[in-house]
Amino acid sequence: MRVFGIICEYNPFHRGHKWQIDELRRLAGEEECAVVCAMSGDFFHRGDFAIERAHARAEAAVRGGADLVLELPLPWAISSAEGFARGGVSILAATGVVDTLAFGSECGNAAKLQRAAKALLRADFPDALREELAKGLSFAAARESAARALIGEDAAVLREPNDILGVEYCKALLQSGSTIAPLAILRKVVGHNGGAAKGFASASHIRELLTNGEDASAYLTAESAAIYARECAAGRAPVTMQNAERAVLSRLRAMCEEDFARYDSGNEGLYRRFYDAARTAASVDELLSAVKTKRYAYARLRRMLLAAYLDVTAADVPPEVPYLRVLACNERGRKLLKTIKKTGSAPVLTKSADVRALSEEAQKLFALTARAADQYVLAYPELRAARGSSAWTEGPVIV
């Protein structure tokens, strides 16, 4: 059986995501196949709260065609594109069953993305990057310019968001020595930050509609729309950072300059700007505007802000994801889990009792994720729904 892996956020699960899964099954033809997803939990890569809780999004994914959804733990979920990719690849590799990593791409050319990945891994690339950064370029522009000097026009793949992630996936596969093959699927719908077209819309556009209380059902699968409506009725959605803004600002104002330094992973002095801004800012947007410089994208700053709020440091990131936490699955996924438990390289978590058998490092990571989940629920629209300890009490959704 062919097993495809997808590294995702599904924030929320929409028609474009279903199209990708359906396309994988079409590519498999008559051969039996399964789809395993490594999905971010309650917080996501752009440094923000997911619009609905992880189990709801995982259920929507399985009802939309996925077979098994595993959680990408917090430190990797709110990391850079490089860290996000490394965590996702680590999970898929640890299953021992995934043979192909599929992802959307603006260029649709895995070989081109692999060439760019190899360029970024060259021993002379860091020096070339530093030279470009010294010219005052943003990190993204400097990276593309440095890569262009090594591989020419192929460096253009470092301009588009999905291609950039694809390059990072290829890098992670190369660095880990994994036998998983990359599969770039040409995107035929709107871009990462685009609006809507032909019945499809970007996740960011859908989140904007949902946050504003507008109807986005035309862009969601019927199952995803129904699940989201259920979450809203229960007072659990939409979730936004603005709902937790006072808690976030309170945490940041209580921190000293040395505290902020713990979350500045690049040791680039950003922590001083955060410390100064946190003293006076009356909103998260105001704080980020005060910290912003030409060199850093807002997503980078939001990730650092979220890491500070949730107390996630580089020390919390093991070399590999130490467990496979199941969020949702169907019957095919359950059968796959039996194989994973026998041949996988990481323990599978389906209930809280499984945590006690983990290594000390893995237990610490799970506890961190559980604490973050307790902070996440406090951003629910209705506090009556914000009961804590969900990570310890909620099991997988079986579809």
Predicted regions and their residues:
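N-terminal catalytic cores of NTP/NDP-binding nucleotidyl/phosphoryl-transfer enzymes
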Residues: 1-57
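N-terminal cationic-hydrophobic initiation segments that often serve targeting/anchoring roles
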Residues: 25-29, 62, 92-93, 174
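Short loop/turn motifs at secondary-structure junctions
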Residues: 31, 65, 96-97
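A structural micro-motif
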Residues: 32-33, 67, 178-180
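A glycine-rich helix N-cap at a beta->alpha junction
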Residues: 59-73
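Active-site cores that bind ATP or allylic diphosphates and position pyrophosphate for catalysis
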Residues: 72-399
